[in-house]
Amino acid sequence: MPLEMFMFATTRMALLIGGAIGGATFPLFAQETTKNDTVIVTSPVQSGATKLATPDIETPQSVSIITRQQFEEQGATSVRQAVSYTPGVYSNQIGASNRFDYIVLRGFSDGSLDNVYLDGLKMMGDTNSHSSLVVDPWFLEDIEVVRGPASVLYGRSSPGGIVALTSRKPAFDAGGEVKLFAGNNNQRGAAFDVTGPLDDNERVAARLSGMTRYADSQFTPLKEERYALMPSLTWRITDRTRLDLMAYPHRDPEGGSHSGLPYQGTVVPYNGGKISNTFFEGEDDYDKYDRRENMVGYNIEHLFDNGWSVRQKLRYLHTKVTLNQVYAAGWLNETALNRGYSGSGEKMSAIALDNQLDGSVDTGAINHRLLVGIDYQDRSNHTTGYYGAFPPIDAFNPVYGAQPDYITLYSREKHKLRQTGYYLQDQMSWDRWRFTLGGRYDRVSVSNIDKLHDSRSDLDKNNVSTRAALLYLFDNGVAPYLSYSTAFTPTSFADENGNVLEPMKGKQWEAGVKYEPPGGNSQFSAAVYRINQTNIATKEEPTDPYRSIGEIESKGVELEAISHLSDSVRLQAAYTYTDIRYKKSSPQEQGKRAVYAPRNQASAWLSYDVKSGLLEGLTLGSGIRYVNGVTSDRLNTHTLPSYTLVDMVVGYDLSSIGLNGLSAQLNVNNLTDKRYVAACNSLSYCYFGAERSIVGSVSWAF
């Protein structure tokens, strides 16, 4: 169906249904307090797990909400850094590389580049290429980490969960901020944000945010450079109709490093020596990652007189990526590493569309909050790939300036993906009980077109995803729950014969409990789960073709505490236990643990605000992150050494000395400058963790 006809038909259908249905009044913009008979609950609100604003304590799924205050205080410069204190998450998959937001959820690394959503729509990157997209945290209001399958609402997604980003929207109260920052490794940059109404009637508001950042990479001489803007506009067309517009031009002319080095030489000595954690194995003239992202989108929402609402979200993106990389390819002799070359030129366009209708009806004593939706995704990526070889390099005494032995064209492809999904969700309330039922039907088409060899591989699949969950709200703030959900993950990955792999499928059982002390400002949660996924797409080395294996199982425990211990003291703590193993695979891998999945993780962040006295306005904070049990390869040949990282912040609000709106902050990550290896893909590719980072900033809010 042509896109224009699809949009018209689905929008018309939603409007007709919404106009015809009667029911109880339901607010267009959900509040944080919900009432059902005598039960009143006040809780932080999430929307990532249900697509509707729902109190977290009424949500029968593990959800973590990272506020802007949290990730700014911790000095996060990427989404993966912003979620590093969150349970169920491993954000150090490729160590010090800042090129992509790798976020491993519940041990599943196959979706670590494809599980991010912005304002409810999938980011639409192509993980079978180098066209993976990022959004800088400067443009975000909050981040929700939804753990466990989300296919019932979002279609294709990892069984480990999703990361739902919310962008900063225009406000009708005028204000803004200007920020300057600088630090070690030649870090420097600036950012601004300004918002306010455009008319006296407060019908139209606008926001313009922008930033630039530059740094020397840990792996000199590579650089990291970024420029981005986000203009947005909100128009209250009527008292019941609202339109939000946004754009996001983003440029990374220098994408830093993405290097991997052998286990011998990084984790353990090789020939009596260890490679420096700043060693660059490439060639400056042949190493570059240039990414250009351009997004435009809208969200239009209308509230009917009967309390039902209809909305449509759409985003279009176009990206261009250029990659040149010289990489290590194993030891040649006692000191020298072999080197290969990989290059790619990519142009991708995509559209994501979601039509939603929601409202409430009562059937006797049960209230039904219904959501009906139709969404559509269309992505096309044109890629041209090159490979080659470079002369070896001495890893302990490198000399640069080599020219390639050869570089040759090896692929010219077009990756196409289309998905149409129809979904229904019913959030039922009866006294203190909460029931959630959901179902979704997907039609997915994937094509890989090999232009170089005039061949193609196609895959057309239909799938049904389901979810059922039960939760009970005790009057003391305790809410136990049990849930079952399924996952559906088609990809454009191809095997050695060029055939598109069968979609991965998963199912999860999860049980947990949430606790919010009455009258307090704290949230505690605990969850246990088991996820089974079949048709796993995997490969031995980053340069190998993909292959499909039978089944992988992830079992784990997650604990989280977010607490304001007083008006001045805030605590964020988490613990994660993950046991993810191949259940049906080759005899060598059977029962082995998956890579990129720590067995144990623990973290805590404590901050203190001085409210009075000579030090009024001072903020002190520190965090600790512990990681244990990362395996070296799929055969579990070794286990990487555990590591502990310490972070800290010192901030000062200069308003206390009469400089209204002015503040300063110093962030230090990896305070002890610990040298460590964060993860390995195999014994040939291990990734150093980030060295110490020191950044000072000055901000003026007005």
Swiss-Prot record:
Any one GO MF annotation of this record: siderophore uptake transmembrane transporter activity
Localization per record: Cell outer membrane
GO cellular component: cell outer membrane
Domain TBDR plug: 55-168
Signal peptide as annotated in the record: 1-30
GO terms of biological process kind: siderophore-dependent iron import into cell
Alphabetized Gene3D superfamilies for the sequence: TonB-dependent receptor, beta-barrel domain, TonB-dependent receptor, plug domain
Residue ranges annotated for the TBDR beta-barrel domain, each copy included: 173-702
Membrane disposition: Multi-pass membrane protein
UniProt keyword list: Cell outer membrane, Ion transport, Iron, Iron transport, Membrane, Receptor, Signal, TonB box, Transmembrane, Transmembrane beta strand, Transport
Alphabetized NCBIfam families for the sequence: TonB-siderophor
Functional note: Ferrioxamine binding and uptake, in association with the TonB protein.
Annotated family: Belongs to the TonB-dependent receptor family.
PANTHER family cross-referenced by the UniProt entry: FERRICHROME IRON RECEPTOR-RELATED, FERRICHROME OUTER MEMBRANE TRANSPORTER_PHAGE RECEPTOR
Name the UniProt record assigns to this protein: Ferrioxamine B receptor
Taxonomy of the source species: Bacteria, Pseudomonadati, Pseudomonadota, Gammaproteobacteria, Enterobacterales
Gene name per UniProt: foxA
